Regions:
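Positively charged, phosphate-engaging catalytic surfaces used for nucleic-acid and nucleotide handling
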Residues: 1-127
């Protein structure tokens, strides 16, 4: 059988049951893609485009908070091991999708995502 996971009303990820040994190498590739986007590509784009958030850890915070619609550390163990390694396969897919979309994002969208992320923490962009 096939399973479908919805990212939004228009985006779907098709998931087929696979043995764990088949998923593990693929998972590592997805994690590496997430790190390359959030630690290298997006910070470079952020600086060039004048995003209000440019540090890699802030970009990761925005992405993770957006996929949970809450502080990510309310859903994952903070500090035990990297958050991206704790994501379910579906949440990792959502994080990658959002990170890819951020490559084309306007500073206004990033400003909004950052404000949402900070509001989950009861902070404002000036804090």
């Amino acid at each position: 059988g096939k399973l479908y996971a919805a990212y939004s009303d228009t985006d779907y990820l098709q998931i087929r049951p696979l043995p764990f040994d088949k998923i593990k190498p693929h998972r590592r590739n997805l994690e590496q893609a997430y790190l390359e986007l959030t630690q290298q590509q997006l910070p470079e784009i952020a600086e060039a485009a004048g995003w209000p958030v440019q540090e890699d850890h802030c970009i990761q915070r925005m992405v993770l908070d957006a996929i949970y619609q809450d502080c990510w550390y309310n859903h994952l163990a903070k500090g035990r091991w990297p958050a991206y390694q704790q994501l379910s396969n579906i949440k990792l897919g959502q994080a990658l999708l959002l990170a890819h979309r951020l490559r084309q994002a306007s500073p206004k969208l990033v400003e909004w995502l950052n404000a949402c992320s900070l509001s989950f923490r009861k902070k404002t962009p000036t804090d």
